[in-house]
Regions:
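Cys/His-clustered metal-coordination modules, chiefly Zn-binding fingers
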Residues: 197-293
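Interaction interfaces in information-processing and related assembly proteins
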Residues: 1-229
Length: 293
Protein backbone atom coordinates (compact mmCIF):
# COMPACT_ATOMS: atom_id res chain seq x y z
CA UNK A 1 0.00 0.00 0.00
CA UNK A 2 1.42 3.36 -1.02
CA UNK A 3 1.45 6.29 1.38
CA UNK A 4 -1.51 8.65 1.42
CA UNK A 5 -3.37 11.24 3.47
CA UNK A 6 -7.12 11.31 4.16
CA UNK A 7 -8.77 14.70 4.60
CA UNK A 8 -12.17 14.67 6.32
CA UNK A 9 -14.70 16.64 8.35
CA UNK A 10 -17.05 15.51 11.09
CA UNK A 11 -19.79 16.80 13.41
CA UNK A 12 -21.29 18.96 10.65
CA UNK A 13 -18.05 20.84 10.10
CA UNK A 14 -17.16 21.29 13.78
CA UNK A 15 -14.14 18.96 13.40
CA UNK A 16 -11.61 18.74 10.62
CA UNK A 17 -9.39 15.69 10.41
CA UNK A 18 -6.32 14.40 8.62
CA UNK A 19 -4.85 10.90 8.86
CA UNK A 20 -1.88 9.46 7.01
CA UNK A 21 0.11 6.31 6.45
CA UNK A 22 3.74 7.18 5.73
CA UNK A 23 5.69 3.92 5.97
CA UNK A 24 7.25 4.15 2.51
CA UNK A 25 8.37 7.78 2.69
CA UNK A 26 9.83 7.19 6.17
CA UNK A 27 11.72 4.14 4.92
CA UNK A 28 12.93 6.20 1.92
CA UNK A 29 14.27 8.84 4.33
CA UNK A 30 15.92 6.13 6.47
CA UNK A 31 17.76 4.73 3.45
CA UNK A 32 18.68 8.15 2.01
CA UNK A 33 20.15 9.44 5.28
CA UNK A 34 21.24 6.13 6.84
CA UNK A 35 19.43 7.16 10.02
CA UNK A 36 19.74 5.31 13.32
CA UNK A 37 16.49 3.88 14.77
CA UNK A 38 15.86 6.88 17.06
CA UNK A 39 16.66 9.34 14.24
CA UNK A 40 14.32 7.40 11.92
CA UNK A 41 11.54 7.64 14.51
CA UNK A 42 12.08 11.38 15.03
CA UNK A 43 12.35 12.22 11.33
CA UNK A 44 9.45 9.92 10.41
CA UNK A 45 7.18 11.61 12.95
CA UNK A 46 8.03 15.09 11.66
CA UNK A 47 7.73 14.05 7.99
CA UNK A 48 4.27 12.64 8.79
CA UNK A 49 3.20 15.86 10.51
CA UNK A 50 4.73 17.97 7.75
CA UNK A 51 2.90 16.26 4.93
CA UNK A 52 -0.47 16.53 6.74
CA UNK A 53 0.14 20.20 7.58
CA UNK A 54 1.27 20.79 4.00
CA UNK A 55 -2.05 19.68 2.53
CA UNK A 56 -3.85 22.05 4.94
CA UNK A 57 -2.51 24.89 2.79
CA UNK A 58 -4.57 26.10 -0.16
CA UNK A 59 -2.17 27.49 -2.78
CA UNK A 60 -0.41 25.33 -5.38
CA UNK A 61 2.91 27.08 -4.66
CA UNK A 62 2.55 27.25 -0.85
CA UNK A 63 5.49 25.83 1.10
CA UNK A 64 5.58 24.77 4.75
CA UNK A 65 8.80 24.28 6.73
CA UNK A 66 8.95 22.81 10.23
CA UNK A 67 12.19 23.10 12.17
CA UNK A 68 12.97 21.61 15.55
CA UNK A 69 16.22 22.68 17.18
CA UNK A 70 17.19 21.18 20.53
CA UNK A 71 20.15 20.69 22.83
CA UNK A 72 19.98 16.87 22.53
CA UNK A 73 22.45 14.75 20.53
CA UNK A 74 20.39 14.76 17.30
CA UNK A 75 20.73 18.56 17.15
CA UNK A 76 17.53 19.12 15.22
CA UNK A 77 15.25 18.23 12.32
CA UNK A 78 14.05 20.15 9.27
CA UNK A 79 11.07 19.13 7.12
CA UNK A 80 9.60 20.94 4.11
CA UNK A 81 6.25 20.10 2.49
CA UNK A 82 4.00 21.48 -0.23
CA UNK A 83 0.21 21.46 -0.58
CA UNK A 84 0.26 18.49 -2.99
CA UNK A 85 1.62 15.74 -0.72
CA UNK A 86 5.35 16.08 -1.44
CA UNK A 87 7.59 16.19 1.63
CA UNK A 88 11.32 16.04 2.36
CA UNK A 89 13.47 16.35 5.46
CA UNK A 90 16.63 15.53 7.33
CA UNK A 91 18.09 15.08 10.81
CA UNK A 92 21.11 17.21 11.75
CA UNK A 93 22.90 14.20 13.29
CA UNK A 94 21.29 11.14 11.65
CA UNK A 95 23.55 8.54 13.28
CA UNK A 96 22.73 9.35 16.93
CA UNK A 97 22.31 6.26 19.12
CA UNK A 98 20.50 6.31 22.48
CA UNK A 99 19.25 3.64 24.90
CA UNK A 100 15.45 3.20 25.07
CA UNK A 101 13.46 5.51 27.37
CA UNK A 102 11.86 4.32 30.63
CA UNK A 103 8.88 2.92 28.67
CA UNK A 104 11.22 0.81 26.53
CA UNK A 105 10.53 2.98 23.46
CA UNK A 106 12.87 4.84 21.12
CA UNK A 107 13.88 7.98 23.04
CA UNK A 108 12.93 10.74 20.60
CA UNK A 109 12.50 13.23 23.46
CA UNK A 110 16.00 12.48 24.74
CA UNK A 111 17.45 12.77 21.23
CA UNK A 112 15.96 16.24 20.71
CA UNK A 113 16.33 17.59 24.25
CA UNK A 114 15.12 21.05 25.26
CA UNK A 115 14.51 23.41 22.38
CA UNK A 116 12.26 25.29 20.00
CA UNK A 117 9.72 24.32 17.31
CA UNK A 118 9.33 26.72 14.38
CA UNK A 119 6.67 26.57 11.65
CA UNK A 120 7.27 28.72 8.57
CA UNK A 121 4.52 29.08 5.96
CA UNK A 122 5.39 30.72 2.65
CA UNK A 123 1.95 31.36 1.17
CA UNK A 124 2.81 34.05 -1.37
CA UNK A 125 2.62 37.05 0.97
CA UNK A 126 5.41 39.62 1.25
CA UNK A 127 6.73 37.95 4.40
CA UNK A 128 6.34 34.28 5.36
CA UNK A 129 4.28 33.44 8.45
CA UNK A 130 6.51 32.25 11.31
CA UNK A 131 5.14 30.62 14.47
CA UNK A 132 7.46 29.52 17.25
CA UNK A 133 6.92 27.61 20.49
CA UNK A 134 9.07 25.82 23.03
CA UNK A 135 9.23 22.02 23.00
CA UNK A 136 6.97 20.74 25.77
CA UNK A 137 7.90 17.03 25.64
CA UNK A 138 10.23 16.87 22.59
CA UNK A 139 8.24 13.81 21.43
CA UNK A 140 6.93 15.95 18.49
CA UNK A 141 3.17 15.14 18.54
CA UNK A 142 2.57 16.91 21.87
CA UNK A 143 4.81 19.77 20.76
CA UNK A 144 2.69 20.29 17.65
CA UNK A 145 -0.52 20.09 19.72
CA UNK A 146 0.93 22.90 21.86
CA UNK A 147 1.96 24.85 18.73
CA UNK A 148 -1.57 24.67 17.24
CA UNK A 149 -3.11 25.83 20.54
CA UNK A 150 -0.73 28.74 21.14
CA UNK A 151 0.29 29.94 17.67
CA UNK A 152 -2.82 29.15 15.62
CA UNK A 153 -5.42 29.21 18.45
CA UNK A 154 -6.78 25.88 17.19
CA UNK A 155 -7.47 23.14 19.78
CA UNK A 156 -5.99 20.00 18.20
CA UNK A 157 -5.06 16.41 18.88
CA UNK A 158 -1.90 15.21 17.13
CA UNK A 159 -0.74 11.58 17.07
CA UNK A 160 2.43 10.50 15.27
CA UNK A 161 4.31 7.22 15.34
CA UNK A 162 7.02 5.12 13.73
CA UNK A 163 7.40 1.40 14.47
CA UNK A 164 10.66 -0.33 13.54
CA UNK A 165 11.39 -3.90 12.50
CA UNK A 166 14.15 -5.86 14.26
CA UNK A 167 16.44 -5.20 11.24
CA UNK A 168 15.88 -1.43 11.76
CA UNK A 169 13.73 -0.99 8.65
CA UNK A 170 10.39 0.80 9.04
CA UNK A 171 7.48 -1.49 9.94
CA UNK A 172 4.76 1.18 10.27
CA UNK A 173 4.55 4.97 10.21
CA UNK A 174 1.64 7.37 10.25
CA UNK A 175 -0.43 9.77 12.26
CA UNK A 176 -3.49 11.95 12.55
CA UNK A 177 -4.34 15.58 13.27
CA UNK A 178 -7.85 16.37 14.56
CA UNK A 179 -8.86 20.01 14.98
CA UNK A 180 -11.86 21.66 16.60
CA UNK A 181 -13.13 24.53 14.48
CA UNK A 182 -14.62 27.76 15.93
CA UNK A 183 -18.10 27.17 17.33
CA UNK A 184 -17.60 23.51 18.24
CA UNK A 185 -20.18 22.57 20.89
CA UNK A 186 -19.27 21.46 24.42
CA UNK A 187 -20.94 18.12 23.71
CA UNK A 188 -18.73 17.50 20.66
CA UNK A 189 -15.62 18.55 22.59
CA UNK A 190 -16.25 16.29 25.60
CA UNK A 191 -17.30 13.29 23.47
CA UNK A 192 -14.19 13.66 21.30
CA UNK A 193 -11.94 13.98 24.37
CA UNK A 194 -13.38 10.76 25.80
CA UNK A 195 -13.00 8.95 22.47
CA UNK A 196 -9.36 10.01 22.19
CA UNK A 197 -8.63 8.60 25.66
CA UNK A 198 -9.56 5.15 24.32
CA UNK A 199 -7.01 5.30 21.50
CA UNK A 200 -3.95 3.11 21.80
CA UNK A 201 -0.83 4.20 19.92
CA UNK A 202 -1.18 5.13 16.24
CA UNK A 203 1.42 2.53 15.26
CA UNK A 204 -0.46 -0.28 17.02
CA UNK A 205 -3.61 0.74 15.10
CA UNK A 206 -1.68 0.67 11.80
CA UNK A 207 0.06 -2.59 12.70
CA UNK A 208 -3.33 -4.19 13.37
CA UNK A 209 -4.18 -3.48 9.72
CA UNK A 210 -6.15 -0.25 10.16
CA UNK A 211 -6.03 2.18 7.23
CA UNK A 212 -6.17 5.98 7.75
CA UNK A 213 -9.88 5.81 6.81
CA UNK A 214 -10.51 3.12 9.42
CA UNK A 215 -8.63 5.08 12.09
CA UNK A 216 -10.76 8.18 11.45
CA UNK A 217 -13.91 6.03 11.39
CA UNK A 218 -12.82 4.49 14.70
CA UNK A 219 -12.45 7.93 16.33
CA UNK A 220 -15.10 9.98 14.49
CA UNK A 221 -17.60 7.41 13.25
CA UNK A 222 -20.30 8.66 15.65
CA UNK A 223 -19.80 12.24 14.41
CA UNK A 224 -21.04 11.73 10.81
CA UNK A 225 -17.54 11.47 9.39
CA UNK A 226 -17.30 12.74 5.82
CA UNK A 227 -14.17 11.83 3.87
CA UNK A 228 -13.36 14.61 1.41
CA UNK A 229 -10.09 13.64 -0.21
CA UNK A 230 -7.42 10.95 -0.54
CA UNK A 231 -4.03 12.49 -1.39
CA UNK A 232 -0.95 10.42 -2.30
CA UNK A 233 2.14 11.48 -0.32
CA UNK A 234 5.79 10.78 -0.99
CA UNK A 235 9.33 11.84 -0.13
CA UNK A 236 10.23 14.12 -3.03
CA UNK A 237 13.26 16.38 -3.39
CA UNK A 238 13.47 19.09 -6.05
CA UNK A 239 17.26 19.36 -6.01
CA UNK A 240 18.99 19.24 -9.40
CA UNK A 241 22.35 19.92 -11.02
CA UNK A 242 20.94 23.22 -12.29
CA UNK A 243 20.06 24.33 -8.73
CA UNK A 244 23.50 23.29 -7.47
CA UNK A 245 25.16 25.29 -10.27
CA UNK A 246 23.05 28.36 -9.45
CA UNK A 247 24.09 28.06 -5.80
CA UNK A 248 27.75 27.89 -6.80
CA UNK A 249 27.44 30.92 -9.11
CA UNK A 250 25.83 32.87 -6.26
CA UNK A 251 28.83 32.44 -3.93
CA UNK A 252 30.87 34.76 -6.16
CA UNK A 253 34.03 34.79 -8.24
CA UNK A 254 36.52 34.88 -5.36
CA UNK A 255 35.30 31.63 -3.76
CA UNK A 256 34.89 29.92 -7.15
CA UNK A 257 38.46 30.86 -8.10
CA UNK A 258 39.72 29.42 -4.80
CA UNK A 259 37.94 26.13 -5.59
CA UNK A 260 39.46 26.09 -9.09
CA UNK A 261 42.93 26.79 -7.69
CA UNK A 262 42.64 23.70 -5.48
CA UNK A 263 42.48 21.71 -8.71
CA UNK A 264 40.06 19.04 -7.45
CA UNK A 265 36.53 17.93 -8.29
CA UNK A 266 34.24 19.14 -5.48
CA UNK A 267 31.19 17.32 -4.09
CA UNK A 268 28.02 19.31 -3.48
CA UNK A 269 25.55 17.61 -1.16
CA UNK A 270 21.77 18.12 -0.88
CA UNK A 271 20.83 18.17 2.84
CA UNK A 272 17.29 17.00 2.14
CA UNK A 273 17.88 13.83 0.12
CA UNK A 274 21.65 13.36 0.70
CA UNK A 275 22.36 13.18 -3.05
CA UNK A 276 25.89 14.18 -4.06
CA UNK A 277 26.68 16.24 -7.15
CA UNK A 278 30.32 16.12 -8.31
CA UNK A 279 31.49 19.34 -10.00
CA UNK A 280 34.77 19.17 -11.96
CA UNK A 281 37.36 21.93 -12.23
CA UNK A 282 36.33 22.48 -15.88
CA UNK A 283 32.70 22.89 -14.80
CA UNK A 284 33.78 25.33 -12.09
CA UNK A 285 35.61 27.39 -14.73
CA UNK A 286 32.40 27.54 -16.77
CA UNK A 287 30.46 28.72 -13.71
CA UNK A 288 33.13 31.34 -12.96
CA UNK A 289 32.40 32.95 -16.34
CA UNK A 290 28.71 33.24 -15.38
CA UNK A 291 29.38 34.74 -11.93
CA UNK A 292 28.75 38.49 -11.81
CA UNK A 293 30.64 39.46 -8.68
Amino acid sequence: MSDYIIRATAAEGQIRAFAATTKELTEFARQAHNTSPVATAALGRLLTAGTMMGVMMKGADDILTIKIEGDGPIGGLTVTADSKGDVKGYAYNPEVMLPPNEKGKLDVGGALGIGVLSVIKDIGLKEPYVGQTILVTSEIAEDLTYYFATSEQTPSSVALGVLMNKDNTVRQAGGFILQLLPGASEEVISTLENRLKEITSITSLLDAGNTPEMILEHILGDFDLEILDKIPTQFACNCSRERIEKALISIGKKELQEMIDEGKTIEMNCHFCNKNYPVTVEELKGLLEKAVR
